[in-house]
């Protein structure tokens, strides 16, 4: 029966792939090996749903496919570099001045001057909810045609880092952006046709001010099913496929025609704990749940061995890989058991821990690719004497549970690279948007206040690591590993640059086929 089911599954996916190929409209042919540098097919889990980049899933897809540009971009080493901007200098603790490229032009030919940059950023502030937090506390004005002055509410805020966020692409704010004909961006490729949530075709922008791309046309397609995405690259139909989950990576082992890129992203797979639950109010219980996890085993079972353990939230950020300081640096079920004993949760003959007749229980909610790691956590917590349960389902179930407060633990992964104060306060300040469990710790809050006023990069780093360590010690969350996700490229495609920020990085001017 297993072989029959597998065969039927393969037939179904093969059929889906064939239907996808047949659905390509006139003028857009599937990728073919050895076709030269005329066309590249980029496939990912989802693409833009609107010609206006303010609409979800946002402008990162336009940055990824070469249509849109950011003022600054983070390179693979984690260093912020000028992109559409020519440079930047800090005038005082609250003031920065961005120099623009006089040669910069939108697709329409309109100059990308200081007024147009300010207008674009203010449009993002008004219309893009994902961009707004990165513009909070920033004000913009044009000093002259090619200089934008940025004033910050916080001292020594890293403006280049904030403006490198993937939702802050610079567009012509005077254009309607309601159709392919009216959208006006600045990238090396220009959108020529668009089927929302299906396919976008882009052609080389002949008037691009920067380095001209080698490949003439990009076909950007959405394939939501992971197995069908894998088949797209293995069959040669696609040239770059994003979002390869760990459970499918073994299919690339030994392949000579495909390269799998697995640079860990700056995103930490995290177990968020609901601190309003009676059993989780005691820090000793939370610490025990963390000491009682074998993270090495979780990496094998939940990430197919394609990641590495971390014990702090910033541990997935390449700038903070040394964060941790010995916190939960090994699997220690004995220590976990001792902490639970100390907290009054005694192990009884049936293998469960009780206090005052109440069983120590945990209900863990997972979604998407989190089922395997959730079940592994359930097994490890059960060995501690916890009555652990996993509920796997659609993400909407987690959202509903958070709104009602009816949850013990849930798994999510957030980006960890960016302005440290914005990121850490969003996760661990009392009113942080991702502080799901209601963590409110006086020492953490004081450290965050110091971080908000840190005057140097060295001070920001030191304080960020202190916040990170304090949070890990108090254990409102349990940190597991960088969430792995692969990118597959054809072996004859050269010039692809793997990046820990995969959301906005795929197409570059140097890509070419050999």
PLM segments and residue spans:
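N-terminal lobe/hinge region of extracytoplasmic solute-binding protein
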Residues: 43-92, 99, 119-122, 184-186
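A structural "hinge/loop" feature
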Residues: 45-62, 84-85, 110, 158-168, ...
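Gly/Pro-rich hinge or "lid" segments in bacterial periplasmic/extracellular proteins
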Residues: 79, 155, 161-213, 217, ...
């Amino acid at each position: 029966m297993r072989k029959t089911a597998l065969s039927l599954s393969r037939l179904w996916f093969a059929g889906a792939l064939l239907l996808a190929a047949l659905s390509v409209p006139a003028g857009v042919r599937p990728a073919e090996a050895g076709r030269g540098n005329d066309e590249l097919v980029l496939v990912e889990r989802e693409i833009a749903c609107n010609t206006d980049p303010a609409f979800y899933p946002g402008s990162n897809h336009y940055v990824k496919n070469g249509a849109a540009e950011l003022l600054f971009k983070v390179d693979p080493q984690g260093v912020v570099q000028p992109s559409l901007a020519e440079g930047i200098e800090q005038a005082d603790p609250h003031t920065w001045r961005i120099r623009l490229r006089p040669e910069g032009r939108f697709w329409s030919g309109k100059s990308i001057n200081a007024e147009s940059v300010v207008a674009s950023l203010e449009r993002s502030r008004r219309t893009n909810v994902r961009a707004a937090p990165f513009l909070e506390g920033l004000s913009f004005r044009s000093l002259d045609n090619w200089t934008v002055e940025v004033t910050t509410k916080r001292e020594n805020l890293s403006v280049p880092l904030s403006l490198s966020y993937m939702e802050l692409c610079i567009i012509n704010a005077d254009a309607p952006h309601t159709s392919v004909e009216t959208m006006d961006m600045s990238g090396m490729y220009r959108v020529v046709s668009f089927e929302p949530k299906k396919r976008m075709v882009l052609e080389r922008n002949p008037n691009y001010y920067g380095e001209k791309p080698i490949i003439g046309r990009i076909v950007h397609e959405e394939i939501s099913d992971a197995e069908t995405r894998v088949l797209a690259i293995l069959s040669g139909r696609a040239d770059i496929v994003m979002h390869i989950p760990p459970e499918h990576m073994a299919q690339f082992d030994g392949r000579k025609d495909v390269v799998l890129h697995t640079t860990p992203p700056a995103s930490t797979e995290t177990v968020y704990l609901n601190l309003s639950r009676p059993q989780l109010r005691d820090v000793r219980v939370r610490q025990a749940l963390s000491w009682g996890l074998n993270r090495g085993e979780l990496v094998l079972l939940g990430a197919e061995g394609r990641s590495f353990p971390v014990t702090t939230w910033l541990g997935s950020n390449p700038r903070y890989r040394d964060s941790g300081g010995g916190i939960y640096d090994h699997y220690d079920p004995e220590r976990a058991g001792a902490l639970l004993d100390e907290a009054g949760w005694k192990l009884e003959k049936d293998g469960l821990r009780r206090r005052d007749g109440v069983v120590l229980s945990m209900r863990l909610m997972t979604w998407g690719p989190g089922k395997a790691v959730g079940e592994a956590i359930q097994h490890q917590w059960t060995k501690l004497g916890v009555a652990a349960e996993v509920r796997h389902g659609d993400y909407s179930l987690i959202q509903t549970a958070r709104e009602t407060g009816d949850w013990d633990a849930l798994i999510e992964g957030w980006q960890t690279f960016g302005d440290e104060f914005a990121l850490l306060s969003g996760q661990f300040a009392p009113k942080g948007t991702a502080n799901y469990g209601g963590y409110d710790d006086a020492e953490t809050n004081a450290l965050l206040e110091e971080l908000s006023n840190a005057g140097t990069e060295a001070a920001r780093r030191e304080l960020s690591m202190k916040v990170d360590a304090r949070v890990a010690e108090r254990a409102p969350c349990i940190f597991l590993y960088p969430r792995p996700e692969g990118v597959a490229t054809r072996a004859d495609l050269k010039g692809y640059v793997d990046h820990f920020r995969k959301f906005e990085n795929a197409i570059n001017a140097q890509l070419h086929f050999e």
